[in-house]
Design a protein with these regions (language model features):
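Acidic, low-complexity intrinsically disordered segments
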Residues: 2-248, 252-253
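Catalytic cores of alpha/beta
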Residues: 117-122, 302, 362-377
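Radical SAM enzyme core and accessory elements
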Residues: 2-6, 59-62, 68-72, 145, ...
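Flexible glycine/acidic-rich beta-alpha junction loops that bind and position SAM and/or redox cofactors
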Residues: 12-16, 80, 115-118, 221, ...
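Conserved strand-turn element in the central/C-terminal portion of the radical SAM core barrel
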Residues: 49-52, 265, 294, 321-330, ...
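Radical SAM [4Fe-4S] cluster-binding motif and immediate context
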Residues: 25, 188-355, 373
C-alpha cells in the first residue's frame, strides 16, 4: 500500500471577499476521497489549505512524511472550486512543483483540472483526472504501488478520464462518469479536520458554527452558462436515511448549530424530502440547515416537507426578472414561479435567498430594471449577485469564446470582470450589484417601512439609481456603443 498526502489548493486568505465573508467549510469532496483511500488500505495524511496561513504546514508534511503520492483533489461541492479562480490555480501549480521536488508522484483532480489539465501537467503533475475521477484513481494507485517508477503514459494507459503529457500536449483517454464509490466509502474523514479552527472563525464572525454536507451529486438541468465538469448532467441522490444518520453523527460529534447542504439541488423529489424529514426525526438528527433549489420544484408540499426536515433557508437561482433572459439561459423557470416559490417558502417559515446573474448575452437595461422590480416585489431575505462568467464546457462559453481576451478566469471570487462583449462595462454591473444589495438590505433589515428613516434611505437609494441610469450610455461597452451608432 502507498503513503499518500491528500490536499487541495483553496486558501481562504488568498480570496479577500471570502475572508470578509468568514464562512469557511472543510473540503467535503477531498475528505470523502481520504475516506475512500483509507478503506482501500493506503496510509493517508491530509493538508487543508482552507484555514492555512500559507504553505508551511504543507511543506512540513512533504518533508516529514515523504509521501510516495501527493493527490490534489479539489472540493467539487464548493462553488469556489467550481469558479476555477486563477489565484487557486497558481497555488496548486506551486504546490505541485514542491511535491515533485520532494520526490513524490503527483495526481491532480478538480473542476479546473478537468477544463484545463495542461497547466497542472506542465507544473509537474504526472496525471490529471478528468471529471470525478474516482474509479480511475483506484485503478492508477495499484499500478503505482506495483511499479513506483512507471511512466505517466503507462500509468494512464487504457484508462478513461486520465490525462498525461504526450510531448507538450495533454492527452486524455476519454471522459469518466461519476462513480457510485463515494456512498460506499462511509463517512468523510472528519477526524482530520481542525474543527476548533473552523468553529473559532464562525463564532467570531457570526455567533454560530456551521458544517457542510451533501445529499446528492450533480444537476440534470441544462442552463447554458452552468459549468458541470465533474458530474455532467447526472443527478446521483443518496439514501435519505443515510443522510439523516450522517447528520446525527455530526450533531453528536461536533455540535454544529447549522448545516449547509452543498448540493446543486437539494431533494429534487418531494417524496425523498419527506422521507428525509421522517428519518431526521427518528434519528434525533435535527439541525437547522440551508439548501439550494429551483423555483419550479417548490410545490406547497415541498415547502412543508422542507420545513419539517429543519430547513431554515433556501437559495433559489432566480437569475433575472426578465423572462426573455431566463429563456435565453435555457433556465426552464418563469419569473412567476420565482415569486410563487418565495411566497410558499415564506409561508413555511423558510428564509429565501436569490442568486442574481447580470450581464448575460443580450441583456439590456429594461431586463436589469425587471430584475430590480422582481427584488422589490418578491422581497428575498438575501441575494447573491454575479455577472455571467463563461467557463469551458458550457454552451455560453462556446457562444462567446471568440470574444475572450487574455483573461479567461477570474482572479478571486469578487472579481466580476466581464470577459466577453456584454452590453455594459464591469463597473456598471458592479454598481448595479451594490444597489441591489442595498435594496434587499433595506427591505429585509432596515427601519419599518412607514418610518421617516426608511423613507430617507429609500429616497437616497432611488437617487443613486437615477444617477447611475442617467449615465448608462457612458457605461456601454465598445461593441454595444458601435451597435447603437449603427
Amino acid at each position: 500500500m502507498l503513503s499518500i498526502l491528500v490536499c487541495h489548493s483553496y486558501y481562504l486568505r488568498r480570496d479577500q471577499k471570502q475572508v470578509l465573508r468568514a464562512k469557511p467549510y472543510p473540503p467535503l469532496a477531498t475528505l470523502q476521497v481520504v475516506s475512500l483511500l483509507r478503506k482501500a488500505g493506503h496510509r493517508v495524511a491530509f493538508f487543508d489549505a482552507m484555514l492555512a496561513d500559507g504553505r508551511e504546514e504543507y511543506d512540513r508534511l512533504l518533508q516529514a512524511d515523504r509521501p510516495q503520492v501527493v493527490l490534489f483533489y479539489e472540493d467539487n461541492f464548493n462553488f469556489l472550486s467550481k469558479m476555477c479562480l486563477d489565484t487557486m490555480r497558481r497555488a496548486a501549480c506551486d504546490m505541485i512543483a514542491s511535491a515533485r521536488n520532494a520526490g513524490a508522484r503527483v495526481i491532480s483532480a478538480g473542476p479546473d483540472v478537468t477544463d484545463a489539465p495542461g497547466p497542472y501537467l506542465n507544473a509537474g503533475a504526472d496525471l490529471a483526472l478528468i471529471g470525478e475521477g474516482l474509479s480511475a484513481l483506484l485503478e492508477v494507485l495499484p499500478r503505482l504501488d506495483s511499479n513506483p517508477q512507471a511512466s505517466s503514459a503507462d500509468l494512464a494507459r487504457g484508462l478513461a478520464g486520465v490525462a498525461s503529457l504526450g510531448g507538450a500536449e495533454a492527452l486524455a483517454g476519454g471522459v469518466s462518469k461519476a462513480s457510485a464509490l463515494i456512498p460506499d466509502a462511509g463517512l468523510a474523514a472528519w477526524d482530520l479536520v481542525d474543527m476548533d479552527g473552523y468553529r473559532a472563525v464562525w463564532l467570531k464572525a457570526h455567533g454560530y458554527f456551521s458544517l457542510n454536507m451533501a445529499a446528492s451529486r450533480g444537476c440534470p438541468f441544462r442552463c447554458t452558462w452552468c459549468a458541470k465538469p465533474i458530474w455532467g448532467n447526472q443527478y446521483l441522490q443518496r439514501n435519505a436515511t443515510e443522510v439523516a444518520q450522517e447528520m446525527a453523527f455530526l450533531k453528536r460529534s461536533f455540535k454544529p448549530d447549522h448545516i449547509w447542504f452543498a448540493d446543486d439541488i437539494f431533494g429534487f423529489r418531494v417524496d425523498w424530502v419527506a422521507e428525509f424529514a421522517a428519518s431526521v426525526r427518528a434519528a434525533d438528527a435535527g439541525i437547522p440547515f440551508s439548501i439550494q433549489t429551483r423555483a419550479d420544484l417548490v410545490s406547497e408540499r415541498m415547502a412543508e416537507a422542507l420545513r419539517e426536515a429543519g430547513c431554515r433557508e433556501a437559495w433559489i437561482g432566480a437569475e433575472s426578472g426578465s423572462q426573455r433572459v431566463l429563456d435565453a439561459m435555457n433556465k426552464g423557470t418563469t419569473v412567476a414561479e420565482v415569486q410563487v416559490a418565495r411566497d410558499r417558502l415564506k409561508a413555511a417559515g423558510i428564509r429565501v435567498g436569490f442568486f442574481i446573474q447580470l450581464g448575460y448575452m443580450g441583456e439590456e437595461l429594461d431586463d436589469i430594471l425587471a430584475t430590480r422590480a422582481l427584488l422589490e416585489a418578491a422581497r428575498p431575505d438575501e441575494i447573491g449577485v454575479s455577472v455571467s462568467y463563461p467557463l469551458p464546457g458550457t454552451k455560453f462559453y462556446d457562444l462567446v469564446k471568440a470574444q475572450l481576451g487574455g483573461k479567461t478566469h477570474w482572479r478571486e471570487s469578487d472579481d466580476l470582470d466581464m470577459m466577453f462583449h456584454g452590453t455594459y462595462t464591469s463597473d456598471f454591473y458592479r454598481s448595479v450589484r451594490n444597489l441591489m444589495h442595498d435594496q434587499v438590505a433595506l427591505q429585509s433589515g432596515g427601519a419599518p417601512p412607514a418610518s421617516d428613516e426608511h423613507r430617507r434611505v429609500q429616497h437616497a437609494l432611488d437617487r443613486r439609481w437615477q444617477d447611475l441610469l442617467s449615465q448608462e450610455l457612458n457605461y456601454r461597452s465598445r461593441p454595444a456603443r458601435a451597435a447603437l451608432a449603427g
